[in-house]
Amino acid sequence: VVFYEALQRIHDVYNDDASEIWEGCPNSAAVVCRFLQFKGAGVKIATMAANLLVRDYHVEMADYCSIDISPDAHVRRIFHRLGLIPREDNLEMTIYKARELYPCYPGIIDVACWEIGREYCRPKNPDCESCPMSSCCPTHEAMG
């Protein structure tokens, strides 16, 4: 049903052309809002979709400041272990910390954190020695 309704929305609102969602170099908030209008799309999906457009498909927007990080378990673990947030379960703090770190495009650090969390900074048995963040990681230093 959700997929059908998305196709129907693209047909009705965007003249059967999904690229009209980001046509004309709109600001990132407008693109995220357009994705939020699709049934089933929450903030995480909407910002992730905008992030994919920019990062993987090189879609230009007037700005990138409304493309937030998606605070999944890997990203939150990285931020917590790096000492950027006090608790691993704090979604809002993760988003705002990413905005503080790189206000012009907070979502750009999403994939790097996700990959580091999946490959090195695992919940159990982290591979700190191979991690690209080990030189600036207080958790690694404390374990060392």
Task: Locate each region found by the language model.
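HhH-family (HhH-GPD) DNA N-glycosylase catalytic core used in base-excision repair
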Residues: 1-144
